[in-house]
Structures are given as structure tokens and as C-alpha cells.
């Protein structure tokens, strides 16, 4: 998605450790028009699939997730990183390993929000090692849902997450695929 | 907003301790069409104001916040509850007291995302005691922004948060104002 690549080139910051900071339009400040365009692009890329629900993860997945759900006219569920006090019903849990902090965190989704046989599109803002996606796939499988695909706004294809998704037979689409940060610059691949 | 009140009556669950759980369309599963309608209603209610940016708080504020920003055609910033590893620049911090857990949590916004003199519309999903709103007002003041108003998707008007906002001279709007949960039922006030 050229619009997104151009924006990453213009506003993204490459930090040490192959980290891309895009706080000005995705991860802290959000450009809602761009998020809507991402949603429309996901709709186009998964147009051959029946989608009943979008599954994403708080916090940065919510903006692209809700816009994708809006254009698909389906509900969106966001996995929570803590079980809130109002979450008094049974939940599905999954581990999400944090490479930054070297600890297992957990995400959860209330059981009654996912139904057996439902067709889920998983949306994430960033797929690097793909730990959040692995957690969402785990939860979708516990709920016996069908995963119609995984859509990433940005994928760092050299960190294994996108390969993991494809190796598990899932349809993977990234709106911007980053191959490397050689010389402190963002280098895009051909997948978008 | 009658559509929202009807939805709360239909799908909301009143729990002990004057807690309203609306996980099926706002706080865990999200109805994106309803969120867009909330955004349009906030635009109408604050139509007399110049708005440069929407400020909200992760996680449940993001969906109504980004839809409001979409219809206003302005950026949205969500305050973070933890400082992420990529947030390497200076941030504004504010305390947010948790009545459930009796502890002070913190929220933060990167300084360079808020500019002196900018006109901010603060959006929150739920205003009860209003602690998250107080934190966002605090941050907006640190940044020397103008607060053009505070919009709540749902306000529990008997818990003080909406009064606090008005007592501080701020324009307050709630799309659904709950006066009480007498007899385990949701009773709406006249403000919406």
C-alpha cells in the first residue's frame, strides 16, 4: 500500500535494535483517515473470504481493527492484556512472549464473544516475531473459530512472524512489508 | 442518543457496585457502526467549537475516539497506560486513581504530539468518577492546549466525574447519561 509506505518513509523513526517507531500515525497518535484506507485495503485483500468478525489486540490494534470491521460491517473484538474487573465470565487465555522484556504476558477474550465456526479475520498493527498474532490464533483455535486470514498494517518480514503465519497455512497480508533497516533506512519488500 | 440508550438497555449488564458492563459493543467487543454514529453525534454536539485533535485514553477510548476523529477529520492521540519501549522521547505524565484497585496508575502522552494552543476534544468511553478524564485534562494543561470539551459515550452522573468536568468550566456532553441503577435497572437522565 503505497500511501502507507510513503507515510512510514516520511514519519517513521528507525531506532536501535530494528525497532520502527510510528507514533505519529499508528501507535500513539493515529491518523483516522489512513486507518480507514487500511481497512478498505484489508477488505479488498480478503475479498474472497466470508468474514464474520475481526479479532485484534489492545491497544494499537484497535484503530486499524475497528476501521476494518467498519468497512466489512462486522463486529470487532479486541483481546485484553489484563482481565478487567467487569470481566466476570469465562475467558480464553493465551501467552504472548515479549521479546523486549523477556517475559510471558497474557491476553484474554471472553468466551461468549467468540462462537464455534465463526470466520475470524485477525488484524494486528505490527507483526515482527508475531507473538500477539500467535496468541490470537491460539485463542481462535480454543474457540473453534475458522481463521480466514491475518492482516498486518506493518510486517517486519525478517523477524519470523509473517513466516510463522504462512507456515501454519494461513492467508497473510501486510499493507507494508519491511525487509530490512539497512543503513538506518526502511527497505520495503514486494509483498504489498 | 436514543440508539445508544436502547443498546445499553438491551445488552448492558448491571453488576454489583453500580458497575455497568457493556462488553458486547464498547469495552471488549465493539460495534463499529455504532461507534461511527457516536462520532457523528459528538461532531454535532461540539459543532460550535474549533477542534484540532481528539485526545482519548487506551484501550476502550480508542474506538469511539478514532471514529470521532474520523468524522472531524483531525488526528487522534491516545494516552498510554505504560510508557512503551519505543517511547524514548519526553512525555507528559498524569496520575489516574483507580477506585477498583485503590491505587494511582499513570497515563502518559509524548510531548511532541500536543502543541501549545491546540484545541483538544477529550473523548472517553465511560465517565464515572472521571479519573481518566482528570488525567487527560491534567496532560492537556501541561501541554498548554485549549480543552474545547469532554465527550463521554456513557456517563454515570451520580459518581461525580461529569460534575467535576462542568465545575471546571468545561463543556461536557454524554451520549448516554445514567442517573441510577435502582432495582438493577439502568435509569437514564435527561442530558442526552
From Swiss-Prot, chains A, B:
Presence of the UniProt keyword Cytoplasm in the record: yes
Gene3D superfamilies, per this entry? 3.40.50.2020
Record bears the keyword Chaperone: no
One BP annotation, GO: XMP salvage
Positions in coiled-coil regions:
none
List the keywords (alphabetical).
Cytoplasm, Glycosyltransferase, Purine salvage, Transferase
Question: Binding of 5-phospho-alpha-D-ribose 1-diphosphate: at which residues?
Answer: 128-132
Q: What class of enzyme is it?
A: transferase
> Which compartments does it reside in?
Cytoplasm
Give me the Gene Ontology terms describing cellular component: cytoplasm
- Catalytic function, reaction form: XMP + diphosphate = xanthine + 5-phospho-alpha-D-ribose 1-diphosphate
Q: What is its EC number?
A: 2.4.2.22
User: Per its UniProt record, what CDD domains does this chain match?
Assistant: PRTases_typeI (cd06223)
Q: Where does xanthine bind?
A: 20, 27, 156
What does the record give as its pathway?
Purine metabolism; XMP biosynthesis via salvage pathway; XMP from xanthine: step 1/1
InterPro entries recorded for this chain?
PRibTrfase_dom, PRTase-like, Pur/Pyrimidine_PRTase, Xanthine_PRibTrfase
Q: What does this protein do?
A: Converts the preformed base xanthine, a product of nucleic acid breakdown, to xanthosine 5'-monophosphate (XMP), so it can be reused for RNA or DNA synthesis.
Assembly and partners are described as:
Homodimer.
What family is this?
Belongs to the purine/pyrimidine phosphoribosyltransferase family. Xpt subfamily.
Question: What is the name of the protein in this document?
Answer: Xanthine phosphoribosyltransferase
Species for this entry: Lactobacillus helveticus (strain DPC 4571)
Gene name of the record? xpt
Amino acid at each position: 500500500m503505497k500511501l502507507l509506505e510513503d507515510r512510514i518513509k516520511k514519519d517513521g523513526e528507525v531506532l536501535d535494535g530494528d525497532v520502527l517507531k510510528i507514533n505519529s500515525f499508528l501507535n500513539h497518535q493515529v491518523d483516522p483517515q489512513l486507518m480507514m484506507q487500511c481497512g478498505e485495503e484489508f477488505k479488498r485483500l480478503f475479498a474472497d473470504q466470508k468474514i464474520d468478525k475481526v479479532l485484534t489486540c489492545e491497544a494499537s490494534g484497535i484503530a486499524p481493527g475497528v476501521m476494518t470491521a467498519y468497512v466489512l460491517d462486522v463486529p470487532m473484538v479486541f483481546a485484553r492484556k489484563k482481565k478487567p474487573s467487569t470481566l466476570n465470565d469465562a475467558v480464553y487465555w493465551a501467552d504472548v512472549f515479549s521479546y523486549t522484556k523477556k517475559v510471558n504476558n497474557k491476553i484474554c477474550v471472553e468466551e461468549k464473544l467468540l462462537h464455534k465456526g465463526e470466520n475470524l479475520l485477525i488484524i494486528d498493527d505490527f507483526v515482527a516475531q508475531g507473538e500477539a498474532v500467535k496468541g490470537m490464533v491460539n485463542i481462535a483455535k480454543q474457540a473453534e473459530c475458522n481463521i480466514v486470514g491475518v492482516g498486518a498494517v506493518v510486517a517486519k518480514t525478517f523477524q519470523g512472524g509473517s513466516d510463522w503465519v504462512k507456515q501454519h497455512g494461513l492467508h497473510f497480508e501486510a499493507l507494508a512489508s519491511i525487509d530490512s533497516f539497512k543503513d538506518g533506512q526502511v527497505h520495503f519488500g514486494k509483498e504489498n
